[in-house]
């Protein structure tokens, strides 16, 4: 197999070498590091388009080659460039160029190369440059290679052109300027948006650079993306390239100078406007347009609509989708549009009356002639509105033909234009009203014949005498309608320098150039062969809505072909601060779930920031000259906590620019269980936490221009800290009982949560349960019975547990968005273990503080239920639970890990007894004569667990205000299993000092004790809870020591004070005369 592949590869190489002119026995060796070859991409300049330069250093070689793909030639399109020169051909640049031109026909090679290539020769070396007419990406070039052949193998170097050019940004006129991508911004254009359509723009900013951007980057595309697969993409080839300096062919037109025009040459197409022509013809459709342009408005502003229409076949336009409705066509409502003739046409390619080519489209040539005639013949008559229609010349019986222009009551005069080939027919028509013979160095010899007639009440028919002329008359003609009501209707061909200027120039006499140089440059294309025409039209038409028809892209300078046969395109004026492309989108599409409409645009391989429609709509609605209420964003409800038990609701902020325009700022607040409440700007509505979380799912703010609504879960903080703890117990092998508690899950309603049971890591079918709607998620204790005898096999080790799933789904008429799932395994039970009660889990399940209630919650369980195989049904079991807490005393909220803790003595909270009659019936009973409102027993016949809620006031009452943390322990006394103790520490510095209600605590009964082996990882004790522990004894000794030390200090102080007083009195007496202190 290996030998076969080698043989095949050898055959391919030999065949390729023979095809390209290489020696059959010489291989091709790629050497990208060869110092004798330099291959590089040359960006466009003022003189040339983009180029590929191959420089071979002086040396001993016989052949030089440059190619755009050596090994894939068969797959390349027409116009493939493969140049292989011998050194002996380097006599002069002219001979080099001549040989390059001879390598391919002009009609293919010139589509890639402007004037073929240039060769330069120095001392034994050669420089070969291929200049491209099209941008490299447009002709889809993968790689370029250049190389030389000496006495041995052919050596070449490869340039991956697309990879090389991509990302080259900066100032093309300054080689030292920094290279960076442009800044791309997405915005909504206020001045061209309406209450039914919005214009989104994608703009490239100059970043302060005043010169043009790097001109060599071929990746010039713009793309708009939005929700629901909205996507509009188009090419921007050549818009930023330096304007050409090649002389243009200008027609000397008679009549008023304002109607003089000039066509675009090929250099203009490649450097400013358009870089190639379509090879396909669009299907024939007949939309109606209004021709309208103000000749004095050079900035493309201030157009006024009229009712003039233009009806012609639109194959000569590239504006339309293949699938548009024939009768209703959507066009961008800019005040102008661009026409382009799809293929080069002249008179000799136009079908004649007696020789009709079925593959030859009728309308391309005749539309071109029609526009030309409007400029050449009508002159100042264009002050009247004009409509144009292409019709067929019908041959009658005998030697005559007729042209029929349909009747129109508003038409004042009918004109008909047809053509006569004067190169083959010298006989003039005898019945023509007017003849204009037009022939100069820029066009082929052609005669245009104009027939005219005043208004009639029927279709206007012109008859043509065919005597001697049947073989010379065109098959198609053009009807031109002059309206009775004068209007401003000008038809203007796009000037050559439009793409580099902000304004349409005044095409006066000074713009008319000498046409003698037209034939000197073979690259120029003659008048009537190709051209881009600029027309204007009004918005006085109707259409059917179709989303694809709104993918209308507009760009700077000249209109570009945007995805042929798929998207519309028009032109737009250039902007001084950057380049702008735009797309129009219907408001009805945007207003449907506006918060889901996220837009972004891309230009020059750089993305803009993402923006939602809501971020742009208020600016469009309130910042322009018109106020569009339907576009204003309705205010949405907002919620914040006012205290521990209440929330405040308000209707959000209205855009300031809308308020400045006088919008009513009142809103009506409503909810699932909230009656309509009128709120003025800044006003709030108070609601309790329970009512908000339990009774309401959605809040709404209704204004005169719309309704803003939000789900409760969206208004509350996220559940990033939501955690669930809980336990499952086996009552027997047919029953599972579970409960859970949660932290920071306050934004959930219990009716949105379901429990999914799992055994051995698999969901149990049919075991899922919807939690009670009467409980909040925060207080979600529940029980569930499920037979597991058939699933759990003892003594095989199994696991059982459950997870909580938030299944809140928001239903809309568009789509369903599932709420983010909250999942956490609350408990995993291992069965099949030895019945060693030292392995029992702690009786203290959880100690936590409520996020809003501020209560410390202590949850306990009768954990012997967790191991049913260790419990016999014959034995009656009773266990007493003693719940105690103690606190760490401190003055700082920071935990002092490096210091010994100063703990208070243990305080009794609650004393509860649980009784199991041996048949699975469990009875809980608080040992108290007074009801404790802070004690919850969760179904004393089903679930072996209870919970105690401890307020901050109670903690302060027990220990004083300076408690940094709490420790909780439970001591159980069992008649048959003894006592064990479990301790769990609780720390929460931020919540420790909340003020809440003071609960009623019953008096605590005495606690007895018993002795047994305690479980692992718990605090060991053998004392009764009423007897002092070792910690308590240590605390008492410490206090006695402090008291003794204090007494000793006081005694010493009194002694020292007495001695001092005696000393002072003695010294005072010594200073007095003896008789002063003697007794009298």
Swiss-Prot record:
User: Which species does this protein come from?
Assistant: Ostreid herpesvirus 1 (isolate France)
Look up the domain of life of the source. Viruses
Q: Where in the cell is it found?
A: Host membrane
* Signal peptide, first to last residue: 1-17
> What spans does the record annotate as topological domain Extracellular, numbered to this chain?
18-1042
Identify the keywords attached in UniProt to this record, alphabetized.
Answer: Glycoprotein, Host membrane, Membrane, Signal, Transmembrane, Transmembrane helix
Its cellular-component GO annotations read: host cell membrane; membrane
Instruction: Supply the name of the protein.
Output: Uncharacterized protein ORF59
Topological type in the membrane: Single-pass type I membrane protein
Principal subcellular localization: host cell
Q: Which residues lie on this side of the membrane: Cytoplasmic?
A: 1064-1080
Lineage, top ranks:
Viruses, Duplodnaviria, Heunggongvirae, Peploviricota, Herviviricetes
Residues annotated as glycosylated? 439, 664, 875
């Amino acid at each position: 197999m290996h030998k076969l592949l080698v043989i095949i590869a050898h055959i391919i190489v030999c065949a390729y070498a023979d095809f390209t002119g290489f020696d059959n026995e010489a291989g091709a060796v790629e050497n990208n590091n060869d110092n004798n070859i330099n291959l590089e991409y040359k960006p466009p300049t003022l003189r040339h388009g983009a180029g590929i330069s191959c420089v071979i250093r002086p040396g001993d070689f016989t052949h030089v080659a440059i190619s755009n793909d050596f090994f894939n030639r068969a797959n390349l399109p027409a116009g493939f460039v493969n140049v292989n020169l011998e050194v002996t051909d380097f006599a002069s640049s002219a001979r080099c160029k001549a040989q390059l031109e001879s390598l391919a026909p002009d009609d293919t090679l010139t589509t890639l190369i402007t004037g073929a290539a240039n060769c330069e020769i120095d001392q034994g070396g050669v420089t070969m440059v291929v200049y491209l007419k099209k941008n490299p990406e447009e002709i889809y070039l993968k790689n370029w290679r250049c190389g030389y052949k000496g006495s041995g193998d052919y050596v070449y170097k490869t340039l991956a052109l697309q990879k090389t050019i991509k990302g080259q940004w900066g100032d093309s006129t300054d080689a030292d300027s920094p290279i960076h991508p442009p800044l791309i911004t997405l915005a909504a254009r206020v001045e061209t948006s309406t209450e039914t359509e919005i214009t989104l723009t994608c703009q490239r900013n100059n970043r302060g650079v005043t010169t043009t951007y790097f001109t060599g980057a071929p990746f010039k595309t713009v793309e708009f993306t939005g929700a629901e697969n909205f996507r509009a993409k188009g090419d921007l080839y050549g818009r930023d390239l330096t304007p050409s300096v090649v002389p243009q062919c200008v027609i000397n037109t008679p009549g008023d100078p304002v109607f003089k025009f000039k066509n675009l040459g090929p250099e203009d197409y490649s450097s400013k406007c358009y870089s190639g022509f379509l090879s396909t013809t669009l299907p024939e459709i007949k939309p109606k347009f209004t021709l309208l342009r103000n000749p004095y408005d050079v900035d493309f502003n201030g157009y006024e609509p009229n009712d003039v229409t233009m009806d012609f076949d639109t194959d000569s336009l590239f504006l339309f989708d293949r699938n548009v409705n024939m009768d209703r066509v959507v066009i961008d409502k800019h005040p102008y549009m661009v026409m382009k003739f799809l293929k080069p046409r002249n008179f000799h390619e136009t079908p004649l009356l007696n020789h009709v080519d079925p593959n030859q489209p009728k309308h391309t040539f005749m539309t071109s002639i029609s526009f030309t005639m409007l400029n050449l013949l009508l002159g100042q008559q264009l002050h009247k509105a004009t409509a144009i229609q292409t019709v067929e010349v019908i041959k009658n019986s005998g030697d005559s033909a007729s042209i029929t222009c349909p009747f129109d009551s508003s038409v004042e005069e009918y004109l008909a234009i047809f053509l006569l080939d004067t190169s083959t027919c010298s006989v003039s028509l005898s019945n023509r009203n007017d003849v204009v013979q037009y022939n100069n160095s820029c066009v082929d010899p052609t005669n245009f014949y104009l027939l005219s007639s005043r208004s009639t009440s029927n279709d206007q028919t012109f008859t043509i005498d065919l005597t001697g002329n049947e073989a010379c008359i065109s098959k198609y003609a053009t009807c031109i309608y002059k309206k009775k009501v004068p209007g401003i209707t000008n038809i203007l061909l796009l000037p050559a320098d439009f793409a580099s200027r902000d304004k349409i120039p005044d095409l006066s006499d000074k713009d008319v150039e000498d046409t003698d140089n037209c034939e000197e440059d073979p690259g120029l294309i003659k008048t009537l062969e190709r051209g881009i025409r600029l027309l204007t039209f009004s918005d006085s038409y109707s259409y059917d809505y179709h989303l694809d028809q709104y993918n209308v892209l507009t760009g700077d300078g000249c209109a570009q072909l945007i995805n042929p046969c798929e998207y519309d395109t028009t032109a737009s004026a250039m902007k001084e601060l950057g380049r702008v492309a735009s797309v129009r989108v219907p408001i009805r599409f945007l207003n449907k779930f506006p918060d889901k409409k996220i837009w972004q645009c891309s230009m020059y391989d750089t993305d803009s920031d993402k923006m939602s429609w809501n971020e742009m709509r208020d600016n469009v609605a309130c910042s322009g000259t018109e106020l569009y209420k339907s576009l204003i964003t309705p205010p949405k409800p907002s919620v914040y906590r006012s205290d521990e038990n209440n929330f405040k609701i308000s209707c959000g902020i209205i855009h300031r620019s809308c308020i400045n325009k006088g919008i009513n700022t009142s809103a009506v607040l409503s909810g699932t269980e909230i009656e309509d409440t009128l709120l003025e700007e800044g006003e709030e509505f108070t609601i309790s936490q329970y009512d908000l979380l339990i009774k309401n799912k959605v809040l709404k703010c209704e204004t005169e221009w719309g309704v803003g609504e939000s789900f409760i879960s969206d208004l509350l903080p996220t559940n990033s800290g939501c955690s669930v703890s809980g336990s499952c117990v086996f009552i027997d092998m047919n029953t599972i009982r579970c409960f859970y508690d949660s932290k920071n899950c306050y934004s959930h309603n219990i009716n949105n949560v379901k429990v999914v049971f799992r055994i051995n890591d698999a969901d149990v079918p049919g075991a899922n349960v919807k939690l009670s709607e009467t409980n909040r998620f925060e207080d979600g204790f529940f029980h569930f019975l499920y037979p597991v005898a058939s699933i759990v096999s003892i003594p095989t080790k199994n696991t059982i547990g459950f997870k909580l799933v938030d299944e809140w789904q928001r239903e809309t008429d568009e789509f369903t968005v599932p709420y983010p799932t909250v999942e956490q395994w609350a408990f995993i039970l291992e069965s099949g273990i030895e019945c060693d009660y030292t392995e029992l889990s702690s009786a203290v399940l959880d100690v936590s503080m409520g996020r809003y209630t501020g209560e410390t919650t202590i949850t306990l369980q009768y954990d012997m239920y967790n191991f049913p195989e260790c419990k016999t049904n014959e034995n009656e079991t009773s266990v007493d639970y003693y719940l105690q807490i103690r606190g760490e005393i401190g003055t700082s909220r920071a935990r002092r890990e490096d210091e010994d803790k100063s703990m208070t003595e243990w305080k009794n909270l609650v004393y509860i007894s649980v009784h199991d009659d041996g048949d699975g019936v469990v009875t809980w009973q608080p040992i108290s004569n007074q009801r404790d409102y802070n004690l919850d027993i969760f179904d004393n016949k089903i679930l072996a667990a209870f919970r105690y809620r401890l307020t901050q006031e109670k903690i302060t009452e027990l220990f004083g205000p300076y408690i940094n943390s709490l420790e909780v322990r439970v001591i159980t006394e069992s008649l048959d299993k003894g006592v064990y103790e479990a301790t769990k520490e609780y720390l929460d510095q931020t919540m420790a000092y909340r003020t809440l209600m003071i609960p009623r605590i019953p008096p605590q009964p005495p606690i007895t004790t018993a002795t047994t082996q305690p479980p692992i990882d718990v605090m060991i004790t053998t004392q009764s809870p009423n007897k002092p522990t070792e910690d308590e004894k240590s605390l008492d000794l410490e206090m006695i020591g402090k008291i003794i030390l204090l007494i000793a200090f006081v005694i010493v102080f009194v002694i020292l004070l007495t001695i001092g007083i005696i000393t002072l009195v003695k010294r005072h007496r010594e200073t007095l005369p003896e008789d002063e202190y003697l007794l009298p």
